[in-house]
């Protein structure tokens, strides 16, 4: 067996892990981000120096990226303990911040909480959405390289037919996260003009993805790089899936109201599942047109990638609806609490629906992107969003206690208007108003596509230079951390230099 065949076999015929374990793994970085905020506040209280871009980068990398690498590799069997540990650590930091509070030092806790709930917020963007996109991007980047090393648990890799692997969430989470900040969500007035102009711009935005998809295909075929055939097919890749999604969704949003995106998502998934169950569509995906697994012809060669696009369109529409809800103008802490509770209840309802669908209809299948897969992706995305929102609220409370606390990529606090004053008094320090958010989270959010491309390129280069199958645990851990450090540093420097590469 050649090395290419050995590497392909290493990531094939896998069945995944439990939904609960993946959910715990997703929530872990949300609490890491919360602890990051506490550490920044605590360090500002103890030390009065101004952090440089280097210290901010190292802080974010050590507190967020390194634990994520460990969670997907050497600490994979202790996710629940990690989660409990970071919660206890965060609670300890919050208690210390509360004890050292510089605001309302003589007021009892309930009075402080009452004042906090009346605080207003301001932010250029929603920190929870930014952190969601960063977490999914970082998880994906870590996994696409780590999966080729023995230290990466096989249960986290992409499943062959049915099951839930951590990497299965990566593709769906990427689509969902992109949908929450798509042009239709961010600029609703953009769709109120000429529909032809809107669709033309949508077509124009995908042409770079066409080159990226074709370029990736050409490189992989020319160097004989290992491929997982049943993932997308012979020629298809994730770039082509994104292209089709970005071509279909504008047409749907021209026909249907933007705020009814959830109905479109539900309709597509239900009709698609009915087609899988009551037509020959499922047989076509699994066995081709001749029933024996042929790869002759464009459709047979890429049947998984082409047909599963329907599921990703539904996930995108669900992301659009969530983005609309998240971007509504909310200016009070109380409003954020209601949003977090609503998302949490919606996620729980979807997880219950997932159980019912898996028992009575069909198990989760990334290969087909079926109904259960779509429900699982949306439910997991909402549970992560609600965790991040709750973390934002708790971090805002910590900032409320310490005068002048600066935490990049978090809500800015403003005192609620008082009847005898024309304007509200801002709690946002002047430094935070004038200084850009120099943090790794903001950089990865703004440069998500560059980070994704860079991760794919460096993963390929490392696989060509390193014998991943026979690497020791220590060496593999060093390589993966160095790979993430290099990619994050490049993206961070590009962000500081304000180098922007955007296609939509």
Curated annotation (Swiss-Prot):
Residues 1-21, 76-81, 153-162, 224-237, 282-305, 360-370, 470-473 are lumenal. InterPro entries: PIGW/GWT1 (IPR009447). One of its GO terms (cellular component) is endoplasmic reticulum membrane. It is a multi-pass membrane protein. It holds the Pfam family GWT1. Keywords: Acyltransferase, Disease variant, Endoplasmic reticulum, Glycoprotein, GPI-anchor biosynthesis, Intellectual disability, Membrane, Phosphoprotein, Transferase, Transmembrane, Transmembrane helix. It is found in: Endoplasmic reticulum membrane. Pathway: Glycolipid biosynthesis; glycosylphosphatidylinositol-anchor biosynthesis. One of its GO terms (biological process) is protein localization to plasma membrane. GO terms for molecular function: glucosaminyl-phosphatidylinositol O-acyltransferase activity; O-acyltransferase activity. Glycans are attached at residue 15. The chain crosses the membrane at residues 22-42, 57-75, 82-98, 132-152, 163-183, 203-223, 238-258, 261-281, 306-326, 339-359, 371-391, 449-469, 474-494. The modification Phosphoserine is found at residue 416. Coiled coil: none annotated. Residues 43-56, 99-131, 184-202, 259-260, 327-338, 392-448, 495-504 are cytoplasmic. Its EC number is 2.3.-.-. Its main location: endoplasmic reticulum. Belongs to the PIGW family. Acyltransferase that catalyzes the acyl transfer from an acyl-CoA at the 2-OH position of the inositol ring of glucosaminyl phosphatidylinositol (GlcN-PI) to generate glucosaminyl acyl phosphatidylinositol (GlcN-(acyl)PI) and participates in the fourth step of GPI-anchor biosynthesis. Required for the transport of GPI-anchored proteins to the plasma membrane. Acetylation during GPI-anchor biosynthesis is not essential for the subsequent mannosylation and is usually removed soon after the attachment of GPIs to proteins. It is linked to Glycosylphosphatidylinositol biosynthesis defect 11: An autosomal recessive neurologic disorder characterized by developmental delay, intellectual disability, tonic seizures associated with hypsarrhythmia, dysmorphic facial features, and elevated serum alkaline phosphatase. This is Glucosaminyl-phosphatidylinositol-acyltransferase PIGW. It comes from Homo sapiens.
């Amino acid at each position: 067996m050649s090395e290419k065949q050995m590497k392909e076999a290493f990531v094939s015929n896998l069945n995944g892990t439990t939904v609960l374990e993946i959910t715990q793994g997703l929530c872990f970085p949300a609490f890491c981000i919360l602890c990051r905020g506490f550490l920044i506040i605590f360090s500002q209280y103890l030390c009065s120096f101004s952090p440089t871009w280097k210290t901010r980068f190292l802080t974010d990398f050590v507190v967020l990226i390194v634990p994520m690498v460990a969670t997907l590799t050497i600490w994979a069997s202790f996710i629940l303990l990690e989660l409990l540990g970071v919660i206890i650590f965060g609670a300890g930091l919050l208690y210390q911040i509360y004890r050292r509070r510089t605001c309302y030092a003589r007021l009892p806790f309930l009075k402080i909480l009452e004042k906090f709930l009346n605080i207003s917020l301001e932010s250029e963007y929603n920190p929870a959405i930014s952190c969601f996109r960063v977490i999914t991007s970082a998880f994906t980047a870590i996994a696409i390289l780590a999966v080729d090393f023995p230290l990466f648990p096989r249960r986290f890799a992409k499943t062959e037919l049915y099951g839930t692997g951590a990497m299965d969430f990566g593709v769906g989470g990427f689509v969902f996260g992109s949908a929450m900040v798509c042009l239709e969500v961010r600029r609703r007035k953009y769709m109120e003009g000429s529909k032809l102009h809107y669709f033309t711009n949508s077509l124009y935005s995908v042409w770079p993805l066409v080159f990226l998809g074709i370029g990736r295909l050409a490189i992989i075929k020319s160097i004989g790089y290992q491929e997982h055939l049943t993932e997308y097919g012979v020629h298809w890749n994730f770039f082509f899936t994104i292209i089709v999604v970005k071509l279909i969704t504008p047409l749907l949003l021209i026909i249907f109201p933007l705020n009814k995106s959830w109905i479109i998502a539900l309709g597509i998934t239900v009709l698609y599942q009915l087609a899988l169950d009551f037509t020959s569509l499922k047989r076509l995906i699994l066995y081709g047109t001749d029933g024996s697994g042929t790869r002759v012809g464009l459709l047979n060669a890429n049947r998984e990638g082409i047909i599963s696009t329907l599921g990703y369109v539904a996930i995108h529409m669900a992301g659009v609806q969530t983005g609309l809800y998240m971007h509504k103008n909310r200016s009070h802490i109380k409003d954020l609490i209601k949003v977090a509770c609503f998302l949490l209840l919606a996620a729980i309802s979807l997880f219950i629906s997932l159980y019912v669908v898996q028992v009575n209809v069909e198990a989760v299948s990334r290969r087909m992107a079926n109904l259960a897969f779509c429900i699982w992706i949306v439910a997991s995305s909402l549970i992560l969003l609600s965790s991040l929102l709750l973390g934002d609220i708790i971090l805002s409370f910590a900032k409320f206690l310490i005068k002048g606390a600066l935490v990049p990529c978090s809500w800015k606090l403003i005192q609620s208007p008082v009847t005898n004053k024309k304007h509200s008094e801002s709690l946002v320090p002047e430094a935070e108003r004038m200084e850009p958010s120099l943090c790794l989270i903001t950089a990865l959010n703004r440069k998500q596509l560059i980070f994704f491309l860079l991760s794919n390129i460096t993963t390929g280069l490392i696989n060509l230079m390193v014998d991943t199958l026979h690497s020791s645990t220590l060496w593999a851990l060093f390589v993966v951390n160095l790979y993430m450090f290099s990619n994050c540093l490049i993206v961070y420097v590009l962000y500081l230099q304000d180098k922007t590469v955007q296609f939509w």
